Amino acid sequence: MQMTAEEKQTSAKIPAERSTCDIYIPPERKAIAGGGKPHVVARDFSIYYGEFEAVKKVNAEILSKYVTAIIGPSGCGKSTFLRAINRMNDLIPNCHTTGALMFDGEDIYGKFTDEVLLRKKIGMVFQKPNPFPKSIFDNIAYGPKLHGIKDKKKLSEIVEKSLRKAALWDEVSDRLDKNALGLSGGQQQRLCVARALAVEPEILLLDEPTSALDPKATAKIEDLIQELRGSYTIMIVTHNMQQASRVSDYTMFFYEGVLVEHAPTTQLFTRPKDSMTEDYITGRFS
């Protein structure tokens, strides 16, 4: 495939030693209508496990309807930060926070925050697919039922709509009554995405969603992220820098709990402002 003049100009800006990391740099993505407003805002936000500060005074704005990737070496705090956004860290003993983390202007850790409602608006998909040991239909209908929807026709509409959004409907429409545990790993992960979408969230958090999948299933998840881009704010933690460059509009780089750099993905991978970012993406440390 021949490079366009714009791509040649971009690649010319990458020093030879950095290009050896073989990262695909996509062209600038088009702006999203109605997107770009701060959806999640962190101000001096820290996360502690007991006295250990796992995430250190993060200041960042996550823009609505765009895809933000979070990269960094193991143990750098990226998953801890992601899980804080819908308060999954509350389940960990002695975990507490300081500073502010806001969602649509409301304090996520505020005294009167309804955690169930928060997790309805901010859905999450984990590293390992975790379908319930129920039918495919009941997996998707579980959330809507939990939030008060009982009408069977309405539930059927939600199930079909959610599975279509997750690009799974055509593969399972004739076996909705079958146990979801019988699906392949890639199908199970898309089922988990559909289950999150069924309650109509505004934000979708993906914690290394393809790390347990084969390349074919990974490609389907990446295609799904692009389909959902513009309809949801998506944040994805990944160890795969090529994946981050393929799917995201913005990238955050964490190291030892510190947000080192947060920039448009193309800029971060071709013109990083911090030498530590450059060292990481060129493979000088991992």
From Swiss-Prot:
PANTHER family: ABC TRANSPORTER I FAMILY MEMBER 17
Protein name: Phosphate import ATP-binding protein PstB
MF terms in GO: ATP binding; ATP hydrolysis activity; ATPase-coupled phosphate ion transmembrane transporter activity
Subunit structure: The complex is composed of two ATP-binding proteins (PstB), two transmembrane proteins (PstC and PstA) and a solute-binding protein (PstS).
Pfam families registered for this protein in UniProt: ABC_tran
Gene Ontology terms: biological process: phosphate ion transmembrane transport
Enzyme class: translocase
Described purpose of this protein according to its UniProt entry: Part of the ABC transporter complex PstSACB involved in phosphate import. Responsible for energy coupling to the transport system.
UniProt entry tagged with the keyword Aminoacyl-tRNA synthetase: no
Listed SMART domains: AAA
Main location per the UniProt record: membrane
Family of the protein in this entry: Belongs to the ABC transporter superfamily. Phosphate importer (TC 3.A.1.7) family.
Lineage, uppermost ranks: Bacteria, Pseudomonadati, Chlorobiota, Chlorobiia, Chlorobiales
Catalytic function, reaction form: phosphate(out) + ATP + H2O = ADP + 2 phosphate(in) + H(+)
Species of provenance: Chlorobaculum tepidum (strain ATCC 49652 / DSM 12025 / NBRC 103806 / TLS) (Chlorobium tepidum)
Membrane topology: Peripheral membrane protein
Keyword annotations: ATP-binding, Cell inner membrane, Cell membrane, Membrane, Nucleotide-binding, Phosphate transport, Translocase, Transport
Domain ABC transporter residue range list: 40-281
An annotated GO cellular component: plasma membrane
